Amino acid sequence: GGVVPWPIRTVVIPPPILASIKSHVATHHPNEAGGFLGCQRRGRRLRATRHIPIPNESAIPKRRFETTVDERVPPPPRVFYHSHTSPESISGLTKLDKRSIPEPFALIIFAPHGNALSYRGFKHGVLEWRELQVEADTGRQLARL
């Protein structure tokens, strides 16, 4: 077999893509919004190169984000993201998120009032989800609550 690459530790979201995500989340508030980030792998980092917003198909969109993974979705490596919009919700993965997200990489954006306050990245390991760093282009960590 080949060499197993080092595990991903960081998601990098350049400013133009970050601005696009923020706008998408704010526009759909108080409903949860989401989509995918098409990425390139650079060593231990996933660098977002495209933002693909996807409609929320949940019957209870203020509480849950549900969508269909189809041809709109970029090929791996990719990061699935969605917002948590209720002030009572948490800034990380809920129990439901942990069970229901079928993707290896997830980004939760905590936006209880529409503006994104926190970005938390996660990778699905063998047994559980592990937290990743989330950075802007400059290597500075994005807000994390």
Where are these regions (language model features)?
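Conserved beta-strand-loop surface patch within small alpha/beta domains used
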Residues: 1-77, 85-145
